[in-house]
């Protein structure tokens, strides 16, 4: 029963995070697909249909500062590969999205490459190679301060991923627009590859796929609201990770009799 308290709390955090993410996606749809808060204003024609006056149709490149390629480096220090880094793989993306810091592999890259490839708070990492017949490439996650702190601000993505640095004011808008496109299957139409590994034509997607772009002040207001959801998801993820580690530490000691349940103050753990 004591161990199940850990599992129950971890599961509760997972469900809360799932709900928070759904709320953020619903808010995005309300604002930028259905235009609910703006229906009393004037609308104009565009190539994507009627949009609020003052908005425009553009592409992802209009709200992206730059993109970064990945680096896989070496398994151990070798020659000029001396900079220790942690690499985000496509397989790590689902965990990072849930707020789980995961276990990224350690690699060693050339120091000057790290200066240009190091990930920062607010960056997005996109999986550009992989996928399956039913799962598109293009899965994405955001880089948080908590993730950077855990890995000593030494994170890059692998060369099977690509990092995007959004314009700061559009970072949340870009992320949820990307998520909506991914869930709609749009990334399938930008894939190529005949060797069994699919590759995402990320440059084509960024430069060609038309999107609606709201004014900066609206993008900032959306960011302000969804940042609350995002920070709570990250906080819950950190808590669940700590609970998981503590559970795995206590369980063998409890089973061996080294520690009794009465020795553990569950009030301090589950407060």
Where are the language model's segments positioned?
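A short glycine-rich beta-alpha junction/loop motif
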Residues: 1, 153-161, 187-220
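Sequence-specific dsDNA recognition surfaces
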Residues: 61-77, 91-127, 131-132, 146
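Short, solvent-exposed loop/turn positions at domain surfaces
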Residues: 4, 112-113, 194
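Short coil/turn segments at secondary-structure boundaries
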Residues: 38-42, 73-80, 102-103, 189-191
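Short, ligand-facing micro-motifs at secondary-structure edges
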Residues: 94-105, 127-157, 172, 176, ...
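Glycine- and charge-enriched low-complexity intrinsically disordered segments
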Residues: 162-183
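Amphipathic heptad-repeat alpha-helical coiled-coil/stalk segments that mediate oligomerization
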Residues: 260, 264-271
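Non-catalytic DNA-recognition/assembly elements of restriction-modification systems
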Residues: 1-33, 38-72, 212, 216-262
């Amino acid at each position: 029963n004591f161990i199940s308290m850990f599992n129950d709390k971890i599961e509760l955090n997972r469900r809360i995070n799932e709900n928070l993410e759904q709320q953020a996606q619903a808010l995005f749809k309300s604002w930028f697909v259905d235009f609910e808060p703006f229906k009393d204003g004037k609308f104009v024609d565009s190539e994507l249909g009627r949009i609020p006056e003052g908005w425009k149709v553009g592409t992802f490149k209009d709200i992206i500062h730059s993109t970064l390629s990945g680096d896989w480096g070496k398994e151990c220090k070798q020659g000029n590969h001396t900079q220790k880094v942690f690499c985000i793989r496509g397989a790590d993306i689902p965990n990072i999205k849930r707020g789980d810091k995961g276990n990224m592999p350690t690699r060693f890259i050339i120091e000057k490459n790290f200066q240009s490839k190091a990930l920062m708070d607010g960056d997005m990492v996109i999986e550009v190679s992989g996928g399956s017949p039913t799962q598109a490439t293009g899965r994405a996650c955001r880089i948080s301060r908590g993730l950077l702190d855990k890995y000593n601000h030494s994170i890059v993505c692998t060369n099977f991923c690509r990092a995007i640095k959004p314009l700061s004011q559009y970072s949340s808008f870009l992320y949820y627009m990307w998520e909506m496109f991914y869930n709609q299957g749009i990334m399938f139409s930008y894939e190529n590859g005949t060797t069994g590994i699919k590759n995402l034509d990320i440059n084509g997607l960024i430069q060609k796929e038309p999107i609606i772009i709201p004014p900066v002040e609206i993008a900032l207001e959306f960011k302000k609201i969804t940042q609350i959801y995002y920070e709570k998801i990250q906080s819950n993820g950190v808590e669940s990770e700590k609970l998981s580690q503590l559970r795995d530490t206590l369980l063998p000691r409890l089973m061996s009799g080294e520690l009794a349940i009465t020795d553990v103050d569950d009030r301090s753990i589950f407060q």
